[in-house]
């Protein structure tokens, strides 16, 4: 070997020894900027065709497969959120390893010829626990989230600097794949605060993203509220939308700006107690075809949704609408990574926009699908065996007070003699089970907007036990400051002679039960004793199954009630017998040949014989080769059509009547004079098309000062007709892309009644028709009623 050859060999070895991020930085840098009505990649026009993927929702072993699936669709970019709360689960302790290694995910994208768009929050929404904000922020009771609260901003800056350490070396200027970085996320749907958004922009820049292109996303109805002059503005909207209408205002204020839909919603998310959501492939494909034909960039949210493993699924409001574990989203690539019919329809269209080149082949699935025969859970320990921290207090403590992020809190107090039936009232977040002297009395379910329960007569010194399980924190809107457990005091109200007595217990024992794997294993290892003698089969169950070949599968949880599942130490997510999800995705990369451990934490207890007190029958489960995402087991219908709730309006005088204009977009009609009431009713007399079906996306009411009235306490009270998941509450669910829709063939007039929770004064009515092309189902003639 010559000296020259030796030097070359050593130089090559030195390059190989560099860390991956250093190798990226060592590569030749590029540019990504905005030009005249187009983006410019290295100075040349470029249309972003992005696929939204979320690294925490995909097992790391499958990351590259999912990226290749997106490339086979014709995408050139991966778009991702950075989830603050998964990286900083405890204040000051950061984790960017394993499945949290977002830099490795970005490098895989670059390896496969894909660019990357990074959306580092701090808030991300995404149907994710608290929108990505860490729960421990709530330990500071007076914190103002997503505002210039000093503590909040301090923690945001610390987090974004950590993100910068991971990802700033991977920007395109440093030879990496990252071409754009987002500032905040859909802030217009939260508030109007340019100084706050500006401060977040400055933090992002100082974190190492000072040369990369920055942008902010919002809806066409509110993007100007917080739009910063030095950022690119992008729109978010769903399939079927009128695309020209969505970009109309942007074109007026920035005629030379490139257009981009930063979230084109391919489907929608599922909620416990409602049917599985789906959206037509035709609408998605036609919308993307139209955008590409006009040179409009996009990110398809979601291209592959994946799974909200563990306790990471969030919830929506008004009310409390927790999301299921599956984040399938009816996306082109399904939850377990396979191509759907949507995928192939989209791929066929995308091939037209690939510069005449053939799209890559669809990669083979990393695992086959397997079944596992029925197996038994032969080990059991009561729920109380998982108790960790205990605390005495004068009032019930929240999860946050007890320094617990996720799990269950057991509250115990004693009560004086109560001779008659009484009513227990409080704010229970989220699923409370009530016991008197160990005997089960009933449940209080936040999903159903329940706040009270009837209690039997109780002797002197009776023990009242309330077991409260917390589900995902609200991730969208002003209700994201979502504390868990019992919030505030609990009261017991009863009648004695001619008096109504209200008692407030002031001595409580608070006991935490974390929902992690370590707590479950510890509980199962404890010796049997008589701790907390509640008459329930809630608790920890362990079983095993043996397999000769690993593969992806779906564990069927229909034999159990409500809780969490851990397989070989991996948290699969939440299950709940009400559905619609009845199986949990179990990735084959988490299984092993031979014996596999399954632990179930069931806060309710199994169904059937296995759930009966004194029964020795072991509950069972099995794994199937397909998911069950659309099977409901509800105690009663989730439709809002109870006959007793329909108001007789024949003798009432409407406070407003008239006709809406045809077409998309918000319309506001002022009342002749302000009126006060607790209930409002919208009665549709006809539609713009002449059809009998209506679709109403959103409603706002204005107070006497012209401000929008808070809708967090609104409840759907009555609707004469509701089609599928398009129930009455959709007209105040904060989402402009969903709507209350009546069944085809249902006769006019159509009536929707909303309970606002308290009396309010109303001066104007705002109405948004369905946002889809042509505003199908738009109301024409209407009447508005307000009642006390």
What are these regions (language model features)?
Residues 63-129, 201-206:
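Aromatic-lined substrate-binding rim segments of carbohydrate-active enzymes
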Residues 466-472, 600-607, 683-690, 770:
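Short beta-strand-plus-loop segments that form exposed binding edges in beta-rich domains
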Residues 152-227:
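Active-site neighborhood of glycoside hydrolase catalytic domains
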Residues 572, 642-651, 661-788:
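Aromatic, loop-rich ligand-recognition surfaces of beta-strand-rich domains
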Residues 421-435, 464, 545-568, 575-576, ...:
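Aromatic-lined ligand-binding clefts that engage carbohydrates, nucleic acids, or primary amines
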Residues 207, 211, 240-334, 338, ...:
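Catalytic-core region of carbohydrate-active enzymes that cleave or remodel glycosidic bonds
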Residues 92-98, 111, 122-146, 197-201, ...:
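Aromatic- and acidic-residue-enriched segments that line the glycan-binding/catalytic groove
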Residues 25-77, 107, 550:
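N-terminal carbohydrate-binding accessory modules
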């Amino acid at each position: 070997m010559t000296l020259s050859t030796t030097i070359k060999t050593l130089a090559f070895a030195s390059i190989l020894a560099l860390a991956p991020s250093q190798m990226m930085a060592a590569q030749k840098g590029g540019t990504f900027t905005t030009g005249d009505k187009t983006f410019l990649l290295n100075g040349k026009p470029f249309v972003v065709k992005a696929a939204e993927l979320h690294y925490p929702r995909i097992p790391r072993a499958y990351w590259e497969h999912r990226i290749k699936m997106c490339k086979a669709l014709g995408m050139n970019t991966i778009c991702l959120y950075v989830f603050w709360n998964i990286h900083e689960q405890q204040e000051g302790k950061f984790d960017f390893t394993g499945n949290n290694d977002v830099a490795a995910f970005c490098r895989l994208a670059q390896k496969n010829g894909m660019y990357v768009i990074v959306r580092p929050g701090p808030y991300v929404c995404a149907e994710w626990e608290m929108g990505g904000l860490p729960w421990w922020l709530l330990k500071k009771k007076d914190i103002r989230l997503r505002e210039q609260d000093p503590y909040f901003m301090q923690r945001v800056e610390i987090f974004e600097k950590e993100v910068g350490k991971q990802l700033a070396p991977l920007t395109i200027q440093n030879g990496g794949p990252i071409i754009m970085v987002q500032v905040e996320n859909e802030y217009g749907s939260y508030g109007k605060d340019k100084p706050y958004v500006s401060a977040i922009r400055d933090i992002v820049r100082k974190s190492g993203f000072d040369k990369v292109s920055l942008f902010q996303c919002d809806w066409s109805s509110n993007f100007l509220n917080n739009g910063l002059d030095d950022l690119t503005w992008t729109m978010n909207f769903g399939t079927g939308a009128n695309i020209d209408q969505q970009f109309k205002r942007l074109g007026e204020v920035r005629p030379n700006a490139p257009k981009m839909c930063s979230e084109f919603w391919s489907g929608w998310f599922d909620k416990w107690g409602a049917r599985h959501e789906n959206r037509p492939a035709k609408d998605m494909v036609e919308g993307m075809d139209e955008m590409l034909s006009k040179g409009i960039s996009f990110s398809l949210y979601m291209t592959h949704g994946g799974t909200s493993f563990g306790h990471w699924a969030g919830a929506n409001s008004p009310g409390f609408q927790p999301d299921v574990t599956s984040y399938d989203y009816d996306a082109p690539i399904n939850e377990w990574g396979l191509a759907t019919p949507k995928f192939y329809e989209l791929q066929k269209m995308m091939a037209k926009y690939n510069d005449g080149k053939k799209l890559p082949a669809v990669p083979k699935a990393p695992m086959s699908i397997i079944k596992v025969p029925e197996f038994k859970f032969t080990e059991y320990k009561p729920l109380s065996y998982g108790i960790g921290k205990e605390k005495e207090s004068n009032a019930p403590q929240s999860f946050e007070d007890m320094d617990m992020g996720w799990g269950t809190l057991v509250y115990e107090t004693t009560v004086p003699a109560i001779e008659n039936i009484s009513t227990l009232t409080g704010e229970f977040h989220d699923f409370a089970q009530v016991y008197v002297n160990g005997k089960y009395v009933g449940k209080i379910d936040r999903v159903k907007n329940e706040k009270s329960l009837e209690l039997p007569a109780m002797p002197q010194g009776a023990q009242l036990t309330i077991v409260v399980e917390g589900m995902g924190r609200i991730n969208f809107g002003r209700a994201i400051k979502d504390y868990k457990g019992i919030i505030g005091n609990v009261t017991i109200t009863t009648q004695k002679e001619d008096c109504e007595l209200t008692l407030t217990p002031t001595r409580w024992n608070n006991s935490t039960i974390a929902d992690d794997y370590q707590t479950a294993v510890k509980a199962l290892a404890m010796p049997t004793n008589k701790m907390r003698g509640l008459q329930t089969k809630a608790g920890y169950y362990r079983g095993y199954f043996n397999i000769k070949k690993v593969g992806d599968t779906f564990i069927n949880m229909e034999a159990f009630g409500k809780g969490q599942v851990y397989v070989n130490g991996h948290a699969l997510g939440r299950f709940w017998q009400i559905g619609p999800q009845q199986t949990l995705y179990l990735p084959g990369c988490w299984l092993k040949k031979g014996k596999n451990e399954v632990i179930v934490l069931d806060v309710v207890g199994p169904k059937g014989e296995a759930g009966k007190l004194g029964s020795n029958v072991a509950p069972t489960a099995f794994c199937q080769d397909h998911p069950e995402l659309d099977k409901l087991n509800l105690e009663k219908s989730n439709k809002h059509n109870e006959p007793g709730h329909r108001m007789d309006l024949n003798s009432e005088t409407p406070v407003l009547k008239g006709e809406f204009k045809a077409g998309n977009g918000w319309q506001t009609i002022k009342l002749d004079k302000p009126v006060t009431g607790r209930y409002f009713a919208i009665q549709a007399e006809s539609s713009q098309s002449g059809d009998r079906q209506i679709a109403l996306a959103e409603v706002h009411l204005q107070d006497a000062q012209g401000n929008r009235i808070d809708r967090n306490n609104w409840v759907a009270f009555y609707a004469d007709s509701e089609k599928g998941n398009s129930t009455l509450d959709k007209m105040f669910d904060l989402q402009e892309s969903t709507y209350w829709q009546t069944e085809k063939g249902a006769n006019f007039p159509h009536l929707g009644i909303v309970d606002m929770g308290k009396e309010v004064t109303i001066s104007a009515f705002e109405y948004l028709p369905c946002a889809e092309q042509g505003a199908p189902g738009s109301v024409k003639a209407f009447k508005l009623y307000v009642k006390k």
